[in-house]
Amino acid sequence: FREKSILAGILVLCLIVLLPIGYRFIQNEKEAQQSMDEVLVNAFLDLDESITEDRAKVKALCTNYNSKEFRTLCMKLPQKYLYKTEIIEEIAAYDYSRYGDYDLPDLFSFFVGLEHKAQQNTLTQEDAENLLSLFDLWKSCNWNRVTAERFSQDPQIKEMIREMNSAIERYEMLEY
């Protein structure tokens, strides 16, 4: 009986020590996820701001196509969007099960493809229209209502990203 009492006492002491440690670990994990959600939301909102600006330019170019202006715009796309898409990619890689659906490598690759075509001077009005349709897809999401608290539960964002990636794949298949 005495050995069982000692064993029970040790077990209780272990629980007393481990429970606060476990609780703190869970709190740290929640805080880390909350911070990543906030960084991810800010990256998407920065991306939205840039896309809104570029969408207006591309829309004007689709109406009044100017190959020189479109070429200049396309030459700047990868550099302009690299940092924003890298942040999203890093967070998605950190916790793929939670953030993998938000990764945008296809969008960045599409921008690089447009830059490559601009360097070769082979851009067409169809490229401008494809870019505009991607930007329109992006704007179909109501970014004004996005917050860190609701971001990961918002199916509209994931669906919009899936649609964009599918559209990019279709455009790339047209190229080859």
PLM feature spans:
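Cytosolic-side transmembrane helix boundary signature
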Residues: 1-5
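Alpha-helical segments in soluble extracytoplasmic regions
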Residues: 53-118, 130-166
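Immediate post-signal-peptide N-terminus of mature secreted/exported proteins
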Residues: 24-74
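Amphipathic, heptad-repeat alpha-helices with coiled-coil/zipper character that mediate oligomerization
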Residues: 42-50, 97-103, 124
